[in-house]
Amino acid sequence: MKFLANLKCNHTRASFREYAKILDENLSANDDVSVFAPASAFDEKKHMFRLGAQNFYPCESGAFTGEIGKAMLDEFEIKDVLIGHSERREILNESEEFLRSKFDFAAKNGWNVIYCIGENLSTNESGATKEFLSRQLENIDLGYKNLVIAYEPIWAIGTGRSASIEQIDEVLSFLKTKANVPLLYGGSVNAANIADIAGIKSCDGVLVGTASWDANNFLGLIGAASR
């Protein structure tokens, strides 16, 4: 099972060193773990986890103030990238067109893409979730060999309110009919619900936010998944 930690706008360079040290001392070679750290915390060490980027601009380098280009990621041998997270869609107004340009750039470079999709509460309550997710997936090449899709219902992100096991299973099973790629669930994943989520046949892993920010808490979640 895949365990992806999205640290978002958390951890300094110093605190991430401690975070990484705890993971390195406790993870095994059999653990499939990626950590999407803030760019200021990137390092060149070899870890027991894959280091990923929360964001990038689709360029080698250039006049793009505040952005992160391929040359910068290459320095740290980063090949895993998040695209389409709802916080970037909503807060930073990343459009479907721009997300497509990011996806195409990542695919051209052979990166591992974790493409995030998810509906808001009104869409969910109106029963239009599957149609909405289908439209989001029309934006990318579902045949790309290094694609992972992360389903994160917006109404469950950082709210403490996770989708029910039945809801997650229904949506991920539907997505399996759309794309033969690994599927992740994200949205208030924690140590209390991870075992049930891990038991969903169509679920290949989790994208964890708040519960991953503390290294020991994240390790506890990983351990709880196999109990």
UniProtKB/Swiss-Prot annotation:
It is found in: Cytoplasm. The active site is at residues 85, 152. It is an enzyme of class 5 (isomerase). It catalyses: D-glyceraldehyde 3-phosphate = dihydroxyacetone phosphate. GO terms for biological process: gluconeogenesis; glyceraldehyde-3-phosphate biosynthetic process; glycerol catabolic process; glycolytic process. GO terms for molecular function: triose-phosphate isomerase activity. GO terms for cellular component: cytosol. Pathway: Carbohydrate biosynthesis; gluconeogenesis; Carbohydrate degradation; glycolysis; D-glyceraldehyde 3-phosphate from glycerone phosphate: step 1/1. InterPro entries: Aldolase_TIM, TIM_sf, TrioseP_Isoase_bac/euk, Triosephosphate_isomerase, Triosephosphate_isomerase_AS. Keywords: Cytoplasm, Gluconeogenesis, Glycolysis, Isomerase. Pfam families: TIM. Substrate binds at residues 6-8, 158, 188. Its EC number is 5.3.1.1. Homodimer. Involved in the gluconeogenesis. Catalyzes stereospecifically the conversion of dihydroxyacetone phosphate (DHAP) to D-glyceraldehyde-3-phosphate (G3P). Belongs to the triosephosphate isomerase family. This is Triosephosphate isomerase. It comes from Campylobacter concisus (strain 13826). The gene is tpiA.
